[in-house]
Amino acid sequence: MVFGKFTERAQIVLVEAQKESQYFKHGYIGTEHILLGILKECGFANRVLYISGITVDKVRNLIEDYLGFGDVDVSIGEMLLNPRTKRVFDDSLAKAMMYNHNYINPEHILLALLDDVESIAYTIISNLKVDLKGIKTEIINYINKNDINDAKQLE
């Protein structure tokens, strides 16, 4: 898996996604939980989403509408990624490599989510009627300008 390439900020996204999965008792970490993880990490991807009108409450409400609550209790140490989430993380690494980065930050993850048109996260973002192209442009501009600072966060 690509976790060794995650910056501290990307690790926060994953931890927060796991907490959201536990909140919904889904028993897995899906792209919808990753989206919530990005919204709970205090970085640039978070700010772009919030400025676009995507909030934790809106996303949680849509997850509840689409998937409801499950009945699976998973301990904090277990990380059960569904296949689509694994693919998003692999795609995040590919995005990072496109920019000659040897690390993954939340912005790479968000770009991968925005390209996965069959994911629940993409469906949620689309249903919130935001400017997907504008979000992508903001993220790409940020990545191009901030690669050195994020590389220092790699642990």
Predicted feature residues:
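Histone-fold recognition with a strong bias for associated Lys/Arg-rich disordered tails
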Residues: 1-155
